[in-house]
C-alpha cells in the first residue's frame, strides 16, 4: 500500500513539475484561447482543454516569439501536418499523456501563421490540447480571415487518401 502511495506521489509531482517547467519556459495559454480557431468536430471541456479525433480537424492561429509548444494528451498515436506561413513545416507525432510537444522552434520572432491538421484516422487516437506554450516574448493572435467556404471530400479511402503513408493497413 505504501508503494502505491509513493508511486501516486511521484506521478503527481511529475505532472506538477512538467506544468511548472512549461510555465517557466514562457507564456502559457489555455487550449480554448480565443486567438485559436478550431475547424472540425471538437469538444471544449470546463478546464479549457479541447479534444478531437476526426481526421482533417485542424486549429490555426498566429503567433510571435519564434517558438510554440503544446501540452497534449493522446489516447493512441496520431500524426499532424504543421504548416507555418502556409508552407508544410513538419509532421508531428503525438502520443502519451500530458506531453510537452515542440511544434515550431528556431524560426524568427516575427508574426507567423500556424495551422496544425490531424492526418490520422480517429480510430488511432483522440487528442486533447490542454495548453499552448510560447516563448517569454511570444503572443497568440487570431487569424484575420475566417473562411466562408470549404471543400469537403466525402468518399472511401480512394477519394480521401486513407493510408497514403502506411506500408500496410494497420498503420496510422
Model-derived features: positions:
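Bacterial Sec-dependent N-terminal signal peptides
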Residues: 1-27
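N-terminal secretory targeting modules
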Residues: 20-154, 158-172
Amino acid at each position: 500500500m505504501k508503494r502505491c502511495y509513493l508511486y501516486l506521489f511521484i506521478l503527481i509531482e511529475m505532472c506538477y513539475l512538467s506544468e511548472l517547467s512549461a510555465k517557466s519556459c514562457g507564456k502559457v495559454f489555455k487550449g480554448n484561447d480565443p486567438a485559436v480557431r478550431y475547424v472540425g468536430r471538437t469538444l471544449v471541456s470546463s478546464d479549457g482543454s479541447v479534444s478531437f479525433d476526426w481526421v482533417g480537424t485542424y486549429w490555426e492561429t498566429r503567433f510571435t516569439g519564434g517558438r510554440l509548444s503544446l501540452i497534449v494528451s493522446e489516447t493512441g498515436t496520431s500524426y499532424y501536418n504543421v504548416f507555418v506561413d502556409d508552407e508544410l513545416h513538419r509532421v508531428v507525432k503525438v502520443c502519451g499523456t500530458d506531453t510537452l510537444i515542440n511544434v515550431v522552434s528556431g524560426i524568427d520572432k516575427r508574426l507567423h501563421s500556424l495551422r496544425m491538421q490531424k492526418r490520422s484516422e480517429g480510430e488511432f487516437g483522440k487528442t486533447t490540447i490542454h495548453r499552448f506554450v510560447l516563448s517569454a516574448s511570444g503572443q497568440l493572435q487570431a487569424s484575420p480571415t475566417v473562411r466562408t467556404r470549404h471543400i469537403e471530400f466525402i468518399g472511401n479511402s480512394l477519394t480521401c487518401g486513407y493510408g497514403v503513408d502506411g506500408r500496410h493497413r494497420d498503420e496510422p
